[in-house]
Curated annotation (Swiss-Prot):
Sequence similarity: Belongs to the NPH3 family.
Localization (cell): Cell membrane; Cytoplasm, Cytosol
Protein name: Phototropic-responsive NPH3 family protein NPY4
Effect of a null allele: Plants lacking NPY2/MEL3, NPY3/MEL2, NPY4/MEL4 and NPY5/MEL1 exhibit severe reduction in PIN proteins (e.g. PIN1 and PIN2) abundance which are less phosphorylated and lacking polar localization in the root endodermal cell layer and in shoot epidermis due to increased clathrin-dependent internalization from the plasma membrane; this leads to defective expression of auxin responsive genes, defects in cotyledons and floral organs formation, as well as impaired root gravitropic responses.
GO biological process, one term: protein ubiquitination
Highest rank taxon of the organism: Eukaryota
UniProt-listed Pfam families: BTB (PF00651), NPH3 (PF03000)
Species of the source: Arabidopsis thaliana
């Protein structure tokens, strides 16, 4: 971290309890400055020579007699940065050594501006020195710029607003730079896809800046992302990755417990910042945001916007992404997906997704039959390379709902095309006592056709085996497919 030292004298400031500060020298106190519950016992000359504000507000004695008996008292509790920033300004006036760094420079700069410690009253005054430090050092440092920006959130002054703009400009400019020119340190701890270990020859990743900005409060983060987007040099998918990293940092795991601890405005802000283009946000992240918007009771327009975004990338979604949804919501997503007139390959992916979802949801003995049928029938026209996972869902439903009638069981099994079961699935089905006898006969019939085709030299193309990875992934006969 960069820093700047001002002054050469040793520290002669002492404290009396928590609320009194004074300077040790032979001169008597001439002025008391009150800031909140803290009182500073000081001398006029060092202050008046550098502060226009104090010159205006401290009375001067008319004669020596009055001067001996008079102690001016002034309350400036409204000073930005409070007593800590004011004490640094005072020490500067006394020539006492002070150290400025990214953590305190903004507060001191605002306090100095409040006290009018500018060039009008003394050349190279405190405001000037701080501005030189900011421009030559702080705003040229990536991490210091972020720290400085973070410290502005508790300061309410026109001067702090100007500093925020300068910080944002520095951060946006640095984040937008060509990665080949990035020579400074940055934080990069996220796992990359396929557990790829980055090598020096890989160069600096495009999203190198993402994690450092996660330290910012949401209001400042919003301004930083907008400033970066306005530069127009950072790809939308990197912006999406930045928002994902920030959300994960603030909402651990997107669990109900973690979401109970956050404010709705956090989710609303992240949603507002999402890139509009399809594919720049992962489907997994979109589903997490959508679930969070439902859980937190966000506005309907927000929830509908996210539902549409999820449906647009439904073919990229995994079963784990949608397991937290109820069947009505998943059916709504499927219908939204169908309204886009999707291509065949997308339909195949979504059919596989929903089959896997039903296989998991069927484990719930309280799942209504009509809900199961309604969702499954919504995709009845979708092409599937294999009906293995659909069979798995049907078998699990029959296992957990053994009390349904024969006609209901027949309707459930009617969802499946026995011709599209793999050999392993057929082997399981013919031994499955939960299936109606008619279905077992159909399976045996098509297996016979398959066997006859093999004996005559014609073989049916092997169907793709589809397995959903779950903790309880075994059939009753301890066979997987």
């Amino acid at each position: 971290m960069k820093f700047m030292k001002l002054g050469t004298k040793p520290d002669s400031f002492l404290s009396k309890g928590d609320n009194v500060r004074y300077v040790t020298n032979e001169l008597e106190t001439e002025i008391i400055i009150i800031i909140g519950n803290v009182k500073f016992y000081l001398h006029k000359f060092p202050l008046l020579s550098k502060s226009g504000f104090l010159q205006k507000h401290i009375a001067t004695s008319k004669n020596e007699e009055e001067k001996k008996n008079q102690i001016d008292e002034i309350d400036i509790s409204e000073i930005p940065g409070g007593s800590v920033a004011f004490e640094i300004c005072v020490k500067f006036c006394y020539g006492i050594t002070v150290t400025l760094n990214a953590y305190n420079v903004v507060a001191v700069r605002c306090a100095a501006e409040f006290l009018e410690m500018n060039e009008t009253f003394e050349k190279s005054n405190l405001v000037y020195k701080i501005d030189v430090f900011l421009n030559s050092t702080i705003f040229r440092s990536w991490k210091d710029s972020i720290i400085v920006l973070q410290t502005t959130k508790d300061l309410l002054s026109d001067d702090s607003e100007e500093l925020v703009k300068r910080c944002l400009g520095s951060i946006a400019s640095t984040a937008s730079i060509d990665t080949s020119k990035v020579k400074w340190s940055y934080t990069y701890n996220r796992k990359k896809k396929l557990e790829k270990v980055r090598k020096p020859e890989d160069g600096v990743p495009k999203d190198w800046w993402v994690e450092d900005l996660c330290e910012l409060h949401i209001d400042l983060y919003k301004q930083a992302i907008k400033a970066i987007k306005n530069r127009g040099k950072v790809p939308s998918n990197v912006i999406g990755e930045a928002l994902h990293a920030y959300a994960i940092r603030r909402i651990a795991g997107f669990s109900k417990e973690s979401m109970q601890l956050i404010d709705r405005s956090l989710i609303n802000t992240i949603i507002e910042l999402l890139p509009d283009e399809k594919g720049n946000i992962s489907s997994s992240f979109l589903t997490k945001l959508h679930r969070a918007s439902i859980f937190l009771g966000c506005e309907e327009t927000v929830k509908e916007k996210l539902k549409k975004r999820v449906s647009e990338q439904l073919e990229e979604t995994t079963v784990n992404d949608i397991l937290m949804y109820d069947l009505d919501m998943v059916q709504s997503l499927v219908k939204e997906f169908m309204n886009r007139d999707p291509k065949t390959h997308s339909k195949v992916s979504v059919a596989k997704l929903i089959d896997g979802y039903l296989a998991e949801k069927s484990r719930d003995p309280n799942l209504p039959l009509q809900n199961f049928l309604s969702l499954a029938e919504t995709l009845s026209s979708f092409p599937r390379h294999s009906h293995d996972v659909l069979y798995r869902a049907i078998d699990m439903f029959l296992k957990e709902h053994s009390g349904i009638s024969k006609s209901e069981k027949k309707r459930v099994c009617g969802l499946m095309d026995c011709r599209k079961l793999s050999a392993e699935a057929c082997e399981h089905a013919v031994q499955n006592e939960r299936l109606p006898m008619r279905v077992i006969v159909q399976v045996l019939f098509f297996e016979q056709i398959r066997a006859n085709g093999s004996s005559t030299g014609y073989s049916t193309p092997e169907l793709t085996t589809t397995t959903l990875n779950t903790e309880d992934d075994e059939w009753d006969h301890e066979k997987e497919f």
